[in-house]
Amino acid sequence: MFYPDQFDVIVIGGGHSGTEAAMASARMGCKTLLLTHNIDTLGQLSCNPAIGGIGKGQLVKEIDALGGLMGMAADKASIQSRILNASKGPAVKSTRVQLDRTVYRKVIRSALENQTNLSIFQQPVDDLILKNDLVVGAVTKMGLKFHAKSIVLTVGTFLDGKIHLGLENYSAGRAGDTASISLASQLRKLPLRIGRLKTGTPPRIDARSINFKNLKIQLGDTPLPLFSFLGRQHPPLTQKPCHITYTNEKTHEIIQKNLERSPMYRGIIDGIGPRYCPSIEDKIIRFSDRSAHQIFLEPEGLTSNEIYPNGISTSLPFDVQLKIVRSIQGMKNAFIVRPGYAIEYDYFDPRDLKPTLESKHIQGLFFAGQINGTTGYEEAAAQGLLAGLNAGRLARGEEGWFPLRNQAYIGVLVDDLTTLGTQEPYRMFTSRAEYRLLLREDNADLRLTEIGYQLGLVDENRWCRFNQKVELIEQEKQRLRSIWIKPNSDNQIDQIIKSPLSRETNGEDLLRRPEVNYSLLTSLKPFLPSLENNEAGMQVEIQIKYEGYIVRQKEEIAKQLRNENTLLPLSFDYSLISGLSNEVVSKLNDHKPISLGQASRISGITPAAISILLVWLKKQGLLRRSA
């Protein structure tokens, strides 16, 4: 052919999932092609201008620890950075940043265009090329055929996407972009379970038409929190505040009077919306006892006048949207720049995927992002990185890799999806992780960077800096352990501790006291100086202060790993095993779990059923465990 058409990996879609997938595959050394309908929208923030949040910040940190792009791009584009749950324990602290949309998109595009082994081509994809149950390529709208050993589908809300604005609707992937109709039609022919989901976005407001005078101001933190473990690589952008306002009884009355014009409440929208990001009309119905709902007025950038009113997503008609907005304090004269809308789209049941995100039915085909039923940039990016990694490994003839629930929030995410599936857009929370004390934001690099280096995702610069940090932490812990203080020997120490020393004590024991933190301890003469690396200092404090809890959680994990690593045959009819109930047989045949651990998390699979499976594996000589 006159044009390169042979690749190791093809990624279809250039959103948050697709960009991470393409970068991961290319970083591993695989010849990668990213196919997108529009190069100018690579890395577009389609909804809110922010990244991170409870549970989501942990995902971004893990993406960064594995060499991914999202964290560094967010740091470069940040116009406000905050730590959520700052007063709580380290397990639930989460970073969230407001972004300049334009800067973020430019950073993502620049990274993609300068990535070795990665080519970008602008063309919508209309079909996949299959040989029996093996995917071998993709066909674009203009008929070009590209071939690859593995393909990653990261098509977001574009599959037969339909935008709803009042009782009117039209085909679109998002506002201003056409839907993928042909590809959706072809994918429906595959032996995969499919459904419809819905999400929405609020109207955008011209900041010049808002009266901020009496609204509560919300500033970012100082110093500015960062996502990337590489630290600040650039001067920060000018920081901007957010503002807080509320709906009121008049707002709710307007919505109530116009519910018959809502496509959701008229039954026009079939897709299920996100439980944790409901539309404003959903909020006033579900929480009818509340007289007000909080709205965050978030700036969209340094050179933009647009404000994102976080909290009033809606698909009501434009005239109703205008009344709603103008009923809210500070927005009496508000000018809407873009109307809000809801969008419906196809998604595929993630239970049809292996934990590597490869299809169980079509070899070489990977799914990542909203196509798997998730919502959120961070969830999409995490899946994209994992799918891109495993698409590359498959192309090289290597075994797939995925983190377990005790290793990463990414592991929790893919296990929840591939084991339990989802009937509504899935959002990550810290509460979904049973081992969240071990899966903190602050230690994502300690958990994953070495693995990322072994997998070929982490470059030498990051690896070198990581090892320096690990060495610093161990040296500092040893230093504090070696400094001993006798009772009544130091007035400074006596003044900061609540109960006097009864015996000779070292720095490590002092740091275990709740009233003593690392910064305070290392400001005292016997323990000077403190580490210049603040991240390393934080690790010293957390590892020492929470050591007992961490040890107990690791012991709990060790007990669980026996089942987690006991593999089950993928192609097997469980009705052949005597002693299992019809319900258990049906669910096992439906889910096709890869291990006893995964089987145990399927609703309705009892401990007795797990015992029967274990006995059967032993009798058949099939008892084997993964590494």
UniProtKB/Swiss-Prot annotation:
Subunit structure, as described in the record: Homodimer. Heterotetramer of two MnmE and two MnmG subunits.
GO process terms (BP): tRNA methylation; tRNA wobble uridine modification
Protein name as catalogued: tRNA uridine 5-carboxymethylaminomethyl modification enzyme MnmG
Chain's role: NAD-binding protein involved in the addition of a carboxymethylaminomethyl (cmnm) group at the wobble position (U34) of certain tRNAs, forming tRNA-cmnm(5)s(2)U34.
Residue positions binding NAD(+): 273-287
NCBIfam families found in the cross-reference section: mnmG_gidA
Keywords from the named record: Cytoplasm, FAD, Flavoprotein, NAD, tRNA processing
Cofactors: FAD
SUPFAM superfamilies for this protein: FAD/NAD(P)-binding domain
InterPro entries, per database record: FAD/NAD-bd_sf, GIDA_C_N, MnmG, MnmG-rel, MnmG-rel_CS, MnmG_C, MnmG_C_subdom, MnmG_C_subdom_sf
Originating gene: mnmG
Homology family: Belongs to the MnmG family.
